[in-house]
Each structure stands twice: as structure tokens, then as C-alpha cells.
């Protein structure tokens, strides 16, 4: 019988409050509608469930959110591309989305396309995905090849006929069937500290707080979270900054540079652009 994580609950509460799912450019806001749902049984592991209904076939730019996703394309098909690259990748109908280090574009094949996103809490995908998570970095992997099962294929056509709560119930039942109990990890402490400090952390201090050597921290963090602590901190940091820019588009970059603790504005701009592909000044244009 499935059990709640018990001792992980405190860590999850530390990590969950900063999750940012998607930041869009202003001209993309009307290309789809979203409907948010709460998990039924897996609230300690799943941060959110979002249904996206696309109103046209325009591409949408998504910024990396720092979490693993399960994606179920319920209607239509989609292609994906890294920002500023011309090649497009066809996405499987059901897939595991690993951590992304750069923004990417998603394009539906038609108006009316739908997809469901299951977003894991930070450091919680490891309870369900049967492999080292760094193997999924910047990748989308067919769900059946990851879990070695055809369980979900039997429901593919039926998903569109079901009410959304029944779809969620079936997906959660599948996740419960592949759940693996794991001991508490010092990486939970590191992830919590990264979110608490909005990604502005020193890796050596992070290792010390986690009672690990820097090299051991990097190895375990890669395997349990999906990328290095330095890369992950950057994603959390840029999401924090993107949130500020979205809420306060009138903010002066010079003032923000020093409020955030950057050495100079050039460093700030390069840090932001390395993830989003645009400078902070152009982010809201």
C-alpha cells in the first residue's frame, strides 16, 4: 500500500513555494488557456497539474522551471526546439521531461490542441523515475521506454473521453504503482537552501551545510535532481528574476543588479541571457 513520505514533508514544504512553471513573452499570453488541478493522493510529490488548451498553432516560448514533468498530449501533436535554433523535435504523445538549462519553444499542430502537465516538486521525481535523473537533462523521453510498461497506452484514446479528475486518478494510480521508497537525502537540504536563497548560493557552503564534500555534492545532486547544483541554482535564480521583471516591468536594471548582489550589470545580463536567450531589458518587450 502506498504511503506518504513522512519525514520528507518538511523538506517539501521548504521547496515548493518558489516553483515557477512558465514565463511567457507578452505576445504569447493569449495563445492558450490553462486549467489548474490539485493532485488527489500525491500532493507531497506533485506540485501542480495543469491542462493547456491552445487557441492557435503559434509557437510558445517556455523558460526552464527547475522541475521534472510528465506530459500527456491529449489532443493534437507538438514539436519542440531550443530557442534560437532552427531544428524542431517531434514530441512523443506521453513523455518524461527532464530539467532544461535553456528556454525552449513548443508548437502545437493545430488550434484546439491539449496537453496535461504533471509537475513534480523539487527533488521528488527520483521516487518514481527508475534511473539517474541527470540522464534526462535537456531531453524528452517516451514515457513507456522510461518505465518499461504499456500501461498508459491502453488509456491513450480513452483519455479524451474521460473527465479530467478521472484522467488524474488514472495517472496517479500509475505513479503509485511505480513509486519506490527512498531514505532521506542530504540533497534535500541543498535543494531547500537553493530555493530559500533564490539561487544565490555558494556551492562550497552548500556542501558544508549538506555535510558532503563539494565533489560528492555535485555527484549526488546530478543523479538525484538532474543537473549540477551550479546549473540548478542558476535556473532558480533566473526564475526569481523573471518573476520580478514580470511583476515590476518598470524596474531599473542598474538598481536591480545591485539589489540582487551581482558584481556588475554585464554579469547580470549575461547570466539572464544564458538561460532565456534575451536580455533582462528585452524580457517584457
Briefly describe each language-model feature range:
Residues 2, 12-198, 202-204, 210-214, ...:
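Alpha-helical bundle regulatory/interaction domains
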Residues 5-7:
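Positively charged N-terminal leader segments that act as targeting/secretion signals
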Residues 72, 237-240, 267, 274:
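Hydrophobic side chains within alpha-helical segments
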Residues 218-223, 230-233:
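Long, low-complexity intrinsically disordered regions
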Residues 223-227, 271-281:
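A secondary-structure capping/hinge motif
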Residues 233-242, 282-285:
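Short, basic, alpha-helical segments at the C-terminal edge of helix-turn-helix-like DNA-binding modules
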